[in-house]
Swiss-Prot record:
Subcellular location, record wording: Mitochondrion
Quaternary organization: Component of the mitochondrial large ribosomal subunit (mt-LSU). Mature yeast 74S mitochondrial ribosomes consist of a small (37S) and a large (54S) subunit. The 37S small subunit contains a 15S ribosomal RNA (15S mt-rRNA) and at least 32 different proteins. The 54S large subunit contains a 21S rRNA (21S mt-rRNA) and at least 45 different proteins.
Gene transcribed to yield this protein: mrpl27
Protein name per the record: Large ribosomal subunit protein mL41
GO biological process: mitochondrial translation; translation
Family: Belongs to the mitochondrion-specific ribosomal protein mL41 family.
Amino acid sequence: MHQSLLCFGARRLPMTTKLGHQYYKGTRTGKMGQKTRHGGFLVQWSRVRTFVPPSGDCELLPFVSRRIQATKGTYPEGANGLDGAVYFDLAHS
């Protein structure tokens, strides 16, 4: 038995750039150039965002203190390596 067509239209999923016939959501990035006749893309460098770092000595500091020691993550392994039971135990601990 086939599902009703109403059920297909009633799904409530977030709209992505891949969904919707003849609907373009986009990613708010803007157009950085134009397509050429032969399928290429011509970049207009005046529209490209550039970030200029400070020149010379800069006294900007990182957000994390330099006194913090870097730690490497360790994961417990079960009898079968990192299986679903290990992840389940990690989530509920």
